[in-house]
Curated annotation (Swiss-Prot):
Protein's UniProt keywords contain Amino-acid biosynthesis: no
Residues annotated as catalytic: E142
InterPro entries: LytB/IspH
Organism: Ralstonia nicotianae (strain ATCC BAA-1114 / GMI1000)
Pathway per the UniProt entry: Isoprenoid biosynthesis; dimethylallyl diphosphate biosynthesis; dimethylallyl diphosphate from (2E)-4-hydroxy-3-methylbutenyl diphosphate: step 1/1; Isoprenoid biosynthesis; isopentenyl diphosphate biosynthesis via DXP pathway; isopentenyl diphosphate from 1-deoxy-D-xylulose 5-phosphate: step 6/6
Top-tier EC class: oxidoreductase
Residue positions binding dimethylallyl diphosphate: H57, H90, H140, S238, S239, N240, S282
Amino acids binding [4Fe-4S] cluster: C28, C112, C210
Protein name (Swiss-Prot/TrEMBL): 4-hydroxy-3-methylbut-2-enyl diphosphate reductase
Reaction catalyzed: isopentenyl diphosphate + 2 oxidized [2Fe-2S]-[ferredoxin] + H2O = (2E)-4-hydroxy-3-methylbut-2-enyl diphosphate + 2 reduced [2Fe-2S]-[ferredoxin] + 2 H(+); dimethylallyl diphosphate + 2 oxidized [2Fe-2S]-[ferredoxin] + H2O = (2E)-4-hydroxy-3-methylbut-2-enyl diphosphate + 2 reduced [2Fe-2S]-[ferredoxin] + 2 H(+)
Length: 324
């Protein structure tokens, strides 16, 4: 439905709102795999199982796994010598891997395979002598892990302005990689700025932003013109969830991110005829459905899934956790 058609229909109270569900939404294959790794490790070895950082950036998921015996730590020093530790889906630096080995820890790596792909790119290109621009958010665990695949020669940029300030050693030996959960549109702008300033820059064979990030952003682009407010299910520290909220706002639709049903405020629905709902790649469908239940309790009259891509991606578990 076009925005013109939307404008022609008189808005009614929130009690008559229709909820449109973006497709796809919620868990991606990398998140599914990471959570299953923790659950399988708990089943096989028993609690406690230590996890370095949040396995994925979702408070609901972390709380659930903690209740089952997972212990989330910030540093490997918090893991007993000889204990079992799981690396989060965001990946870790080479230094963290070496520290785990030095402490004699049993390690299961829940790094998303699409993040590992970027790690391999970095290691290969540094070996070939390329200086590498990393497009990403400073301080994000994925960025720290990816930049930590090399001892030096990594340059972080977060914006087009950062590109203008870059000082590189040899423009002819320059490459770039990206964080997997960025805004597709903003990343394209940064890449364009890099290419304009460094025409010889070496590109990844395939874009580093993952399929799930792309698909969920495309789903919001499809949904936004049909609704008057967007609710994103996701935790504040979830990069991909934040990008969904920002995207809806850039498309001119008020957007809110929630972590629990109680955070949905009745006034968001006031006078709204259609409410859009999506969920970040680290948000479980059961949490999204609890938000739908909250919207129904506030008077939403119907829920309608939108058309969209059906994802069927899956990744194998690490050796030692696979079912024989």
């Amino acid at each position: 439905m076009s925005t013109t058609e939307n404008a022609a229909i008189e808005p009614v109270t929130g009690a008559d709102a229709e909820v449109l569900l973006a497709q796809p939404r919620g868990f991606c294959a990398g998140v599914d795999r990471a959570i299953e790794i923790v659950e399988r490790a708990l089943q096989r070895f028993g609690a406690p199982i230590y996890v370095r950082h949040e396995i994925v950036h979702n408070a609901y998921v972390v709380s659930d796994l903690r209740s089952k015996g997972a212990v989330f730590v910030q540093e490997l020093d918090d893991v007993p010598v000889g204990g079992t530790v799981i690396f989060s889906a965001h990946g870790v630096s080479r230094a963290v891997r070496q520290a785990a080995e030095a402490r004699g820890l049993r390690v299961f790596d829940a790094t998303c395979p699409l993040v590992t792909k970027v790690h391999v790119e970095v290691s290969k290109m540094r070996t070939q002598g390329f200086e590498i621009i990393m497009i990403g958010h400073k301080g994000h665990p994925e960025v720290e892990g990816t930049m930590g695949q090399a001892d030096d020669g990594m340059l972080l940029v977060e914006s087009v302005d950062d590109v203008a300030r870059l000082a590189v050693k040899d423009p002819a030996r320059l490459a770039y990689v990206t964080q997997t959960t960025l805004s597709v549109d903003e990343t394209q702008e940064i890449v364009a700025a890099i290419k304009a300033r460094f025409p010889a820059v070496h590109e990844p064979k395939k874009q580093d932003i993952c399929y799930a990030t792309q698909n969920r952003q495309d789903a919001v682009k499809f949904m936004a013109p049909q609704v008057e407010v967007v609710i994103v299910v996701g935790s504040p520290n979830s990069s991909n969830s934040n990008r969904l909220r920002e995207l809806a706002e850039k498309l001119g639709v008020p957007a809110y991110m929630v972590d629990t049903p109680e955070q949905v405020r009745p006034e968001w629905l006031a006078g709204k005829r259609r409410v859009g709902l999506t969920a970040g790649a680290s948000a479980p469908e059961e949490l999204a459905q609890s938000i739908v239940d909250r919207l129904r309790a506030l008077g939403a009259r119907s829920v309608r899934p939108l058309d969209g891509i059906q994802e069927n991606m899956s990744f194998p578990l690490p050796r030692g956790l696979q079912i024989n």
